[in-house]
C-alpha cells in the first residue's frame, strides 16, 4: 500500500461537493448555475410542461383525455327484412334460426333487423333491436315483433 494508491472502500459514502466556495474549487461564483436566466434563480424547479412561455405541446394537441363511449358501444349484426323471406310463414325467427341459416355469425351476437326490401310472409321475430320501418313491414305482413335482451 502506498499513498498514491489509496482509494475509498467499495460502497463508501463520498462527501458532497460544496459549491460557491471560491473560484479555485471549480464550482465557485455561479455554483454551476451559469449566468442569469430562469435556471440560475433560487427555487429553480420549473413547472412541468412549461416551455419558456411559448404555447406548450400539450395545448396544441387535441383533447385526448375526453370521454370516449366506444367501450360501451353495442355492435349489432344487421339483417334486412328482405332476407327474412327465406323462412316459411308462421316461423319463429330468433337468433338460433338466424345462425342456422348463416345470416348471423354466432349465438352471442346482438342482432338488429333493418327495413330494406319487402317481406311477404307472416313471421314471429325475436331480436335485440329493430328499426321502425322494419317493424311496420313485418306487422303489415301479418307477423309479430318481440325485442329481447
Curated annotation (Swiss-Prot):
KW rRNA-binding (keyword) present: yes
Superkingdom of the source?
A: Bacteria
Regions of biased composition (Basic residues) lie at: 36-47
| PROSITE patterns reported for this sequence | RIBOSOMAL_L15
Q: Name one GO cellular component term.
A: large ribosomal subunit
Q: Decide whether keyword RNA-binding is in the record.
A: yes
Which is one GO molecular function term here?
Answer: rRNA binding
The cross-references to Gene3D superfamilies, in alphabetical order and at most eight, read: 3.100.10.10
Instruction: Cite the entry's keywords alphabetically.
Output: Ribonucleoprotein, Ribosomal protein, RNA-binding, rRNA-binding
- Biased region (Gly residues) positions are 23-35
* InterPro entries reported for this sequence: Ribosomal_uL15, Ribosomal_uL15/eL18, Ribosomal_uL15/eL18_sf, Ribosomal_uL15_bac-type, Ribosomal_uL15_CS
What's a Pfam family in this record?
Ribosomal_L27A
Locate the region Disordered: 1-53
Single GO BP term: translation
Family classification:
Belongs to the universal ribosomal protein uL15 family.
Cross-referenced HAMAP family: Ribosomal_uL15 (MF_01341)
> What function is annotated for this protein?
Binds to the 23S rRNA.
Describe the subunit structure: Part of the 50S ribosomal subunit.
Protein name listed in UniProt = Large ribosomal subunit protein uL15
Organism, scientific name: Coprothermobacter proteolyticus (strain ATCC 35245 / DSM 5265 / OCM 4 / BT)
Amino acid at each position: 500500500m502506498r499513498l498514491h494508491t489509496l482509494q475509498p472502500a467499495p460502497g463508501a459514502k463520498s462527501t458532497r461537493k460544496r459549491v460557491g466556495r471560491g473560484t479555485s474549487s471549480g464550482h465557485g461564483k455561479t455554483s454551476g448555475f451559469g449566468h442569469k436566466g430562469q435556471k440560475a434563480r433560487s427555487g429553480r424547479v420549473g413547472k412541468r410542461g412549461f416551455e419558456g412561455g411559448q404555447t406548450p405541446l400539450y395545448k396544441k394537441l387535441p383533447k385526448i383525455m375526453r370521454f370516449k363511449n366506444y367501450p360501451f358501444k353495442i355492435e349489432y349484426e344487421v339483417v334486412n327484412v328482405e332476407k327474412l323471406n327465406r323462412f316459411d310463414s308462421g316461423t319463429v325467427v330468433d337468433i338460433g334460426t338466424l345462425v342456422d341459416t348463416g345470416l348471423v355469425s354466432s349465438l352471442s351476437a346482438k342482432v338488429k333487423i333493418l327495413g330494406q326490401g319487402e317481406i311477404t310472409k307472416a313471421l314471429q321475430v325475436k331480436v335485440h333491436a329493430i328499426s321502425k320501418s322494419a317493424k311496420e313491414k313485418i306487422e303489415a305482413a301479418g307477423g309479430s315483433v318481440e325485442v329481447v335482451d
